């Protein structure tokens, strides 16, 4: 199962860390082992590391309105999102 990293900027680290939206969006896709990271020097930079069983389904889900709504709720700045795939 490939590991995926989503790196992006956020508005508020405390809110982002406590949000249930990651599990709500990625859980039905079978995504597991979701871990969160925040830059200690700049708390507006954050990342999610997760195991993704189906990259095509994951990438399709990231293009949906549900993903846009989850990112908005979480305070993610979508224009800063970079997805890194394990190779």
Where are these regions (language model features)?
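Short S/T/G/P-rich N-terminal loop/turn motif that feeds into the first structured element of a domain
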Residues: 1-87
């Amino acid at each position: 199962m490939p590991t995926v990293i989503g790196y992006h900027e956020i508005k508020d680290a405390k809110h982002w860390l406590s949000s249930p939206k990651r599990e709500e969006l990625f859980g039905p896709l079978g995504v597991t082992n979701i871990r969160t990271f925040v830059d200690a020097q700049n708390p507006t930079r954050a990342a999610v590391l997760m195991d993704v069983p189906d990259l095509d389904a994951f990438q399709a889900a990231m293009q949906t309105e549900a993903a846009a709504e989850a990112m908005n709720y979480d305070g993610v700045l979508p224009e800063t999102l970079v997805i890194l795939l394990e190779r």
